[in-house]
Amino acid sequence: LGYLSEKKYPESFRLVRYYDEEDAVSWIGSSYNVKISRRSDTGLPLIVDDSGNKYYDNVITLSVVRPDGSEFFNRKFTKSDFSSYIGEEYAKKSALLGIVLEKADGDNLKFAASVGAPDVLSDDYVPLIITISRTGGVSIQKDSRIDSNSDQPDYEDEGV
């Protein structure tokens, strides 16, 4: 379930798939480069799902590079950065799944993040928004536009 390097991992543990992403974004009058890298981290506590499967959690590095090549922002995120939004019990069975650039919004860069079930077949996650200001400040909030854990039935508009 992940890219295995020369380092051998126990067969009973699962790695979440690695990814590296790079995007250009027009922000505050210039073109910035956003780099996002996700890796399993064997140093973080193991996740055990309801079926007893064990997973390594992820660390995601988010970097924003100025047009001149200098680094404006660089931070490693782990699930603990989002703990106040997901609850202690949910955190024990969830992983940091991903961070993606959403948009430049005035003086801020907005990123969608998700913490959820590490099984690739699951759609259980908590959506979050990371905002980075032009001064490098970071804020995190739950994304109220989506509710993946809703108990409400899905309704479709007919004739639309």
Describe the residue ranges of each PLM region.
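Surface-exposed acidic loop/strand-edge motifs in secreted or periplasmic proteins
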Residues: 2-96
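Short, solvent-exposed coil/turn segments at beta-strand boundaries
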Residues: 28-31, 66-70, 104-110, 133-136
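A mature extracytoplasmic/lumenal domain signature
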Residues: 38, 66, 78, 113-117, ...
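Beta-propeller blade signature
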Residues: 58-66, 126-136
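Short beta-strand segments
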Residues: 71-75, 124-128, 139-141
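A short, polar/proline- and glycine-enriched secondary-structure boundary/capping micro-motif
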Residues: 84-86, 122-123, 149-156
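Acidic, glycine-rich flexible loop segments
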Residues: 85-127, 132-133
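Short, low-complexity, Pro/Ser/Thr/Gly-rich segments in the mature regions of secreted, periplasmic
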Residues: 136-160
